[in-house]
Amino acid sequence: MTMMITTGNSFDGKVIKQCLGIVRGIVVRSPTISQGLMGGLKSIVGGKIGAYSQMCEHAREEAFQLMIEHAQALNANGIIAMRYDTGEIGQAGTEVLCYGTAVII
């Protein structure tokens, strides 16, 4: 089944038949030792921290997929108002949350 996903509150030309509630995917990641060392050096001299960017992108993708799986478990075929949020966990971890409202179209 194809999952339609939007950051908006509706799908153009579609009628939302039922709202099933909030769905989410949560991932907590921390950098490897080498990523931490490279990130520390980059923070001193400035510039893009590629290892951190890659880690964050993977965490976002994993959280996104977990949100879709949560919606599929509810037999949803759409997710509206999809958002990402992040936060720090302790001194070394980053939480990535992907959430939205599962719907039947």
UniProtKB/Swiss-Prot annotation:
PANTHER family: UPF0145 PROTEIN SCO3412 (PTHR34068:SF2), UPF0145 PROTEIN YBJQ (PTHR34068). This is UPF0145 protein lpp0255. Belongs to the UPF0145 family. Pfam families: YbjQ_1. SUPFAM superfamilies: YbjQ-like. It comes from Legionella pneumophila (strain Paris).
